[in-house]
Amino acid sequence: ACNLAEASWGGGETATMKQIVIPGTSELAGSAIGIITSKNNLVISKNLKSNDRIILLKSNGVNANGISLTRAVAKKLPKGYATKLSDGIMYGDALLTKTNIYAKLIQDLLEANINIHYLSNITGHGLRKIMRAKEDFTYMIEKIVEPQEVFNFIQKHAGLSDEEMYGTYNMGMDYAIFLSEKDVKKAQEIITKNGFESLNAGYIKKGERQVVIEPKKVVFKSDTLNLR
C-alpha cells in the first residue's frame, strides 16, 4: 500500500482489535505524512459548489470496515468462512479482496488539470461519509452500483435494512470525487485508464446537510455522522 501511494510509514495509532490480536502479541497500525507541493493541489471542502457532480469509484469489496459484524455472521454459519456465496466465492475469500489505492489516480487527475473540488473516502460510515464537509449541502445520489454479492450475504444473515447497510458499508462504492460537470467526461476517462470503474452518481445542492440515496429511498441526516 505504501509503494502504491508513494508514501512512507511514519507513525501509527493504537487501534481496538477485539477478536483479532492474540494476547501477548502486538498490532501495528500506520499513518502517513505528506507535503502538498503546490497550493493548486490542495483539495479542501471550501471549493465545493452547488451542482458539482459526484463521481463514485467502484470498490473491490468490504475493505477494512464493519469487520466485527462480518465475523459475527461467520460464527453463525455451519461452514463459517468456507461458506460459498451465490457467485461461487467463499465468504472468507470475499472478505479478503484488496482495497483499492487511489493516490496515483488523484495525482493523474491533478496533472491533467482536473479541478477536483473535494474528495471523500467511503469507509466505516458508509455513504454518510460523503457529507464529511461542514458546509451546508445536500448530496443527491441518483444512481448506485450493484453491490458485490458479499454485501447481500451479510445483509441477509445479519438481518440489516438498506439504511443500516448503506450507513455502515461502502456497498460497492468506496471513494467519492466532487468536480464540475465540464470535467466529468475527462475525469472518467482517466479513472478508466488507471484500471478503476466509476459512476457519475449524482450532484450536490445548497440545503440541509444530508445524503439522499434516491434508488434506496434512504436519507442520512448530518447528526448521524459524528467525526472528529
Q: Model-flagged regions — what are they?
A:
Residues 40, 44, 79-81, 141:
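Phosphate-handling active-site elements
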Residues 62-107:
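Glycine-rich, acidic
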Residues 1-68, 203, 214-216:
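Glycine-rich anion-binding loops of enzyme active sites
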Residues 1-5, 20-28, 87-94, 100-228:
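Glycine-/charge-enriched secondary-structure boundary and capping motifs
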